[in-house]
């Protein structure tokens, strides 16, 4: 919306070069940024909108235009098929300086372009074609820059940076665009706000030394003599993040380096931590489901509901692997546990449109003869093709109404989510690999783990640059395969012309795979007839956080016994640290072990009576046992330190409701909606509270909002056929699961002068997912929709 209902001329969003006269460094940074390439100068976005308009018409594409295409939208051109206007100046403008700097206020944290714009009349002088008028404008600004600063750098932009960014970095879809219902898309704001990183989340596993906002990471200070400099520095308008695709397609080496440096700056860590005998029958646990209708993960912004799984008792482990001398026997099968931890990241990893990336954990084992004995997360075609389907992915896997994967950024057709796996800020994921030790293995195995990232996914890039419909029959037998707003049964071929694509060179780019973090350990190999290696641990005080991270990953997947065992190690190495006791209590609460939870949480309170997370979980314990007064007391201790923690507010409101203090509960729950108007739990409890107060109108209003945001539970039935066709994805869907190696070369040991003279015979290509002799491109061009990536 625009203040006063004014019309803003589209050229206002196309004249960033007028800013260059005084802000050259900032302009040059922006010129390479993803903001500049947000529109139809970005082939990935361009193709998604062309496909959208071909499928459901031009009108729904306006849903995206408010944040991606202001010049096109305000010129009234989004009713025209983009294919007809893609090379016009409006379509190539992207998000210019004026788009962000003319925002006068953010209306809410609901995102989806929920801001007010203000059109500064003096813009016409700044962008005048008359050089004398421009010179006069610039002279007046230099004479007194304060009015210019007040117009384009408003206080809320610094004071409420995250809310400012949320207006476009939090997204939902609804009936006008998907002909279905409200559903959450990506969401960088809520999980940041609810985490310890923001300084507003009380329940995080870790609190940072200092709260961080979006710009602290994504607009770091850089040296500059630009007129907007602060002590010789400006905030980078490269907006460094994770988009390696655009600078690759644009052949922009400086932007690509800035992005790669950002990705590898230590925001995440990988730790090959533990080794244990493989479980005979792994209990996978229940599939995690969210109450909110969402295609994205839900973090600390909602109360965790973890379904217990796995074995009744924890299996002893050998850990940490770099502290002991781990050994395996030839012929045995072992489990290797790798911990991925988010450290300096303020939102889920990965973030953004997580249905469209390749993000996965690779584990490779190579013996001292150079033989690869294990490989999960291999990339086909010598590292240029798709990632093998059995890898451990971090993404959202969605399907349309016919169970076809959402792999063309066709989010409007999403009807069900197969799984979402992202790592919350300040948390961890514990990944399990099942490794068979071959009989003919060397005397030492080196395990290498890499957290790999490729923007975009292989299939999405092929589609964006060369995708076109293959008119062969659909898997349902229809010719041509039907396309509707609810599903697309067509197959895709990557044979379209590259002429006129939005890239520097007319070719499909070979996108880099970035190793965001990695780790390496060595295992000794024992003869098959040697005694079985016994579990061994070495406890060092400096490793308390590694044990804690290991436990966090196990807790979040519902392996509660193993998580408890890990947290107990924390208390052994540092009994004065309350975190180990708190996390044992947190685990006991999930398990329903009230007595144990009370014991350990009271121990934690004795160590630090004011620690917010301890008070929250102790308050939750009191609530579970019906001691509502004590529960409220501990929740209020938390809120005195973290007044904007939504889950604590929701719990206090719930306690007041249970005590029939309806008016007090309403007051507390309204504070939740001030943080997020879409909070599902707040609407549910407000519905009940207003019903208790006899206010039928308000009760029905919150009931309607609750039902609007609540998940469509019946939609999960759609995933069944897809999961049957794609067992690797069904495995990944389970809260607790293991990954095995791709088929590897068969190695035969010949009798020779050296003990390990090696000859290698390769397994046929059919074992890697395609018929022998068929090219990978041909195989993927004729893949059925249910198997496309």
Identify the meaning behind each predicted range.
Residues 748, 752-789:
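Intrinsic disorder/low-complexity segments
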Residues 1-10, 26-55, 77-425, 431-441, ...:
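Primarily the internal scaffold of c-type cytochrome electron-transfer domains
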Residues 674, 680, 684-715:
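TPR/TPR-like (Sel1-like) alpha-helical repeat modules
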Residues 556-569, 576-579, 589-606, 610-613, ...:
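Structural signature of tandem alpha-helical TPR/SEL1-like repeats
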């Amino acid at each position: 919306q625009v203040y006063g209902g004014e019309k803003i001329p589209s050229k206002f969003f196309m004249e960033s070069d007028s800013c260059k006269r005084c802000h050259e460094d900032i302009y040059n940074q922006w010129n390479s940024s993803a903001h500049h390439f947000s529109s139809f100068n970005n082939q990935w976005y361009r193709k998604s909108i062309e496909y959208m308009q071909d499928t459901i018409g031009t009108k729904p594409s306006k849903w995206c235009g408010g944040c991606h295409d202001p010049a096109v939208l305000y010129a009234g051109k989004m009713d025209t098929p983009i294919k007809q206007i893609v090379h016009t100046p409006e379509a190539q403008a992207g998000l210019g300086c004026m788009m962000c700097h003319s925002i006068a206020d953010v209306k809410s944290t609901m995102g989806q372009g929920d801001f007010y714009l203000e059109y500064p009349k003096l813009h016409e002088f700044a962008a005048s074609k008359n050089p004398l008028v421009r010179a006069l404008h610039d002279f007046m600004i230099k004479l007194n820059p304060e009015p210019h600063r007040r117009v384009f750098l408003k206080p809320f932009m610094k004071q409420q940076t995250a809310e400012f960014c949320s207006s476009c970095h939090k997204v939902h879809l609804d009936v006008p665009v998907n002909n279905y219902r409200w559903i959450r898309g990506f969401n960088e704001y809520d999980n940041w706000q609810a985490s310890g990183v923001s300084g507003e989340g009380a329940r995080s596993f870790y609190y940072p030394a200092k709260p961080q906002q979006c710009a602290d990471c994504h607009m770091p200070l850089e040296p500059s003599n630009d007129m907007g400099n602060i002590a010789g520095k400006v905030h980078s308008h490269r907006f460094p993040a994770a988009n390696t695709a655009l600078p690759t397609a644009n052949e922009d080496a400086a932007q690509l380096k800035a992005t790669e440096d950002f990705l590898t700056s230590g925001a995440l860590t990988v730790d090959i931590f533990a080794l244990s005998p493989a479980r005979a029958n792994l209990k996978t646990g229940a599939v995690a489901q969210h109450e909110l209708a969402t295609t994205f993960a839900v973090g600390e912004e909602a109360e965790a509901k973890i379904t217990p799984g796995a074995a009744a008792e924890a299996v002893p482990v050998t850990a940490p692997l770099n502290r002991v001398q781990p050994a395996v026997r030839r012929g045995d099968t072992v489990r290797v546990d790798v911990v991925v931890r988010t450290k300096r990241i303020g939102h889920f990893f990965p973030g953004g449109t997580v249905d469209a990336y390749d993000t996965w954990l690779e584990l490779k084992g190579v013996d001292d003869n150079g033989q690869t004995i294990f490989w999960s997360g291999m990339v086909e075609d010598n590292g240029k093709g798709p990632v093998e389907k059995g890898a451990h992915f971090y993404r959202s896997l969605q399907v349309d109404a016919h169970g076809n994967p959402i792999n063309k950024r066709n989010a409007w057709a999403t009807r069900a989510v197969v799984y979402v796996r992202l790592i919350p800020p300040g948390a961890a994921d514990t990944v399990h690999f099942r490794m068979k030790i071959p009989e003919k293995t060397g005397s030492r195995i080196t395990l290498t783990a890499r957290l790999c990232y490729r923007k975009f996914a292989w299939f999405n890039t092929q589609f964006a640059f060369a995708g076109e419909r293959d008119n062969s029959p659909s898997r349902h037998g229809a010719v041509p395969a039907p396309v509707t707003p609810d599903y697309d049964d067509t197959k895709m071929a990557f044979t379209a012309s590259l002429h006129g694509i939005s890239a520097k060179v007319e070719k499909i780019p070979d996108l880099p795979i970035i190793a965001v973090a990695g780790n390496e350990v060595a295992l000794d190999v024992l003869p098959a007839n040697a005694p079985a290696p016994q579990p061994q641990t070495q406890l060092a005080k400096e490793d308390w956080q590694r044990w804690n991270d290991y436990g966090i990953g196990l807790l979040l997947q519902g392996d509660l016994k193993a998580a408890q065992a890990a947290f107990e190690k924390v208390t052994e190495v540092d009994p004065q640290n309350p975190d180990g006791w708190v996390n044992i209590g947190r685990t006991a609460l999930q398990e329903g072990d009230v007595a144990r939870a009370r014991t350990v949480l009271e121990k934690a309170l004795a160590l630090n009576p004011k620690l917010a997370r301890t008070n929250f979980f102790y308050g939750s314990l009191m609530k579970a046992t019906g001691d509502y007064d004590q529960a409220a007391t501990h929740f209020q201790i938390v809120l005195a330190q973290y007044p904007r923690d939504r889950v604590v507010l929701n719990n206090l409101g719930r306690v007041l409701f249970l005590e029939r203090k309806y008016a007090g509960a309403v007051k507390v729950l309204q504070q939740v909606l001030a943080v997020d108007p879409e909070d599902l739990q707040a609407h549910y409890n407000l519905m009940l509270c207003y019903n208790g107060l006899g206010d039928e109108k308000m009760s029905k209003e919150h009931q309607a909002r609750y039902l609007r945001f609540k998940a469509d539970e019946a939609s999960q039935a759609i995933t069944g056929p897809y999961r049957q066709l794609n067992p690797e994805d069904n495995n990944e869907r389970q809260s607790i699961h293991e990954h095995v190696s791709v088929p590897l070369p068969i190695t035969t040991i010949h009798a020779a002068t050296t003990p390990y003279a090696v000859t290698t015979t390769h397994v046929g290509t059919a074992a890697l997912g395609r018929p022998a002799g068929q090219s990978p491109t041909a195989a993927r061009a004729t893949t059925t929709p249910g198997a496309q990536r």
